């Protein structure tokens, strides 16, 4: 089992986190409150593939990244 561990050290308000395996279509998501000691742990399958990770802050800022699990 794999997990996405996120640590946020600024108060961004509520943050939406989504992870999608672009090869299988599997998706996971959660919402968490950010702050000085805020953390989120999102379990994912860890199946091989290219993944997209997206964070959307309460103010509407969007941060997107990609990673590969072989």
What are the residue ranges of the model-derived segments?
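Solvent-exposed serine/threonine-rich low-complexity stretches and specific carbohydrate-binding patches
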Residues: 26-35
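Glycine-centered tight beta-turn/hairpin loop motif at sheet-sheet or coil-to-beta transitions
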Residues: 12, 25, 58-60
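Short, surface-exposed loop/turn motifs with a glycine/proline- and acidic-biased composition
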Residues: 34-57
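Short proline/glycine-enriched turn/loop motifs at strand-loop junctions of beta-rich domains
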Residues: 9-15, 23, 47-48
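Generic short beta-strand
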Residues: 16-18, 53
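Structural beta-strand segments of beta-rich domains
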Residues: 1-6
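C-terminal tail/sorting-segment detector
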Residues: 52-70
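Short, glycine-anchored, charge-dense loop/turn motifs used at functional sites
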Residues: 21-27, 51
């Amino acid at each position: 089992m794999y997990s996405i561990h996120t640590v946020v050290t600024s108060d961004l308000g509520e943050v939406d986190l989504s992870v999608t395996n672009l090869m299988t279509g599997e998706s996971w998501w959660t919402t968490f409150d950010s702050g000085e000691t805020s953390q989120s742990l999102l379990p994912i399958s860890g199946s091989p593939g290219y993944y997209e990770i997206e964070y959307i802050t309460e103010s509407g800022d969007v941060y997107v990244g990609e990673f590969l699990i072989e």
